[in-house]
A protein has these predicted regions:
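N-terminal leader/targeting and assembly helices and adjacent pre-domain segments
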Residues: 1-132, 139, 150, 226-255
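Acidic, glycine-rich two-metal-ion catalytic cores of nucleic acid-processing enzymes
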Residues: 125-237
């Protein structure tokens, strides 16, 4: 039973590699596997990369050793997700085209170029959609990771060992129930305050009772923020309450 040739498989893989190299460059930046592809390197947008997002929220272009290590791990994780999706896309597209060609030969019919192009386009669009999900999730993680490190430094300069933090919620029709539950008070207006030490660094599972640096779902848009001592909220906005005020304790009936 005749399927597609090795040469055809290689062409499919090259097509997928070109797509993923372009997308990875926009998200991760210039990584070793892309350095010889000057045609796409010059089309990149550095201000959209995870490194830029991380450094912008960190507030420093010269990160400390531990901050550089955090960024390195962030980029490494993103590359692993991209590599996994790349391999999956190659396998799925090759299998679908190969199956189609074999079915046509069994019917004594010539494979249609139009049908093959349709299979290719369908799988490329699917890959782009999945990549977008990865990009959104990893960008949220980069933004909040950089902010968490920046908050830690600012708090330390004020003599605060475990600072109060909250999440700025994007409130629209896409705001999920989990973001409302963990990021807002019952009045649905006042941000819920947490200690930085309570924020998880792994991925969130629905029903868990603490927020996460990486967000509460793959398309989470909530951003971590610092609440300085003495500050609280009025009508959902940060406001000075008074010397000695601790919003974390106040929300829990401890003040």
């Amino acid at each position: 039973m005749r399927g597609i040739s090795s040469a055809s498989k290689n062409k499919i893989h090259e097509l997928i590699d070109d797509l993923f190299d372009r997308m990875a460059l926009q998200l991760v930046g210039e990584i070793p596997s892309l350095r010889n592809k000057k045609s796409i390197i010059f089309t990149s947008k550095p201000n959209l990369t995870l490194a830029h997002i991380f450094l912008k929220t960190l507030g420093s272009e010269r990160p400390l050793p531990q901050e550089r290590e955090a960024l390195k791990n962030l980029l490494s994780t993103a590359e692993e997700y991209i590599s996994s999706l790349r391999a999956k896309t190659k396998a799925q597209m090759t299998e679908k085209i190969d199956s189609y060609v074999k079915e046509q030969h069994l019917k004594n019919q010539r494979p249609s170029t139009v049908d093959i192009k349709s299979i290719i386009n369908e799988n490329l669009e699917k890959a782009k959609s999945h990549f977008k999900t990865i990009a959104e999730a990893e960008s949220t993680k980069a933004r909040n990771m950089g902010k968490a490190l920046q908050i830690g430094k600012v708090a330390a300069s004020q003599g605060v060992s475990d600072p109060n933090v909250y999440f700025v919620v994007v409130r629209d029709g896409k705001t999920c129930s989990e973001c409302v539950r963990l990021h807002l008070m019952p009045d649905l207006v006042t941000p819920r305050v947490w200690k930085l030490s309570e924020i998880g660094f792994g991925y969130h599972k629905k029903g868990e009772n603490n927020p996460k640096i990486a967000g509460l779902h793959c398309r989470c848009r909530c951003s971590l923020a610092f609440l300085a001592p003495g500050f609280g909220f009025k009508n959902g906005q940060v406001a000075w309450i008074g010397e000695g005020h601790d919003e974390y304790r106040a929300q829990r009936g401890q003040q």
